[in-house]
Amino acid sequence: NIIFVSVDTGNVNQEFYDKLIADVKKNNFGMIIYIPFSTASLAIEKNINLWLTDVPTNWKETFNIGNNDLSTLLSLLICKNWKGEIDALIINKNQNLKFPQTDIEDIKTMVRFPNKTNISVKNGDLLSNVKKYRNADVNIFSVDDDMSTAAMINIVNESRISGIFCVDSNLENVLV
């Protein structure tokens, strides 16, 4: 089960959405939160930035890329619908986690990304990286444990690109 909500940033009850996210997580539901940037349109260039965060160091052994399954699946669906392209950006905050080229190729194969998908690893925090890469029609994120509605709105406003934020149900797995 997946719940979809669109957040009007001009009139938002952040506490309501924060509680809804907590309830969704507690009940193992999925959730897709669309936050439009006020002056941006979708699907003009057909470019999608998929931001993968907190990928576990043992992802190949466990076949688990963390809380990134729903966001990755959604990016694949939007890409197919738009006939677009995906830039998958792996945020690496963990200095112990290395992503050699073979791992990047393995992710591309195991997720079944389209051939034109570009996958890169970016060091640092999510917001500073999102502000650097403003070449997309939409940014797609996973909702990390400490991410509030206010933080999501801030990411959209700072990037000046509409955002889709996904809460995993922990029931889907994008890897094959």
Please give the residue ranges for each predicted region:
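Membrane-embedded alpha-helical bundles that form conduits across membranes
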Residues: 1-176
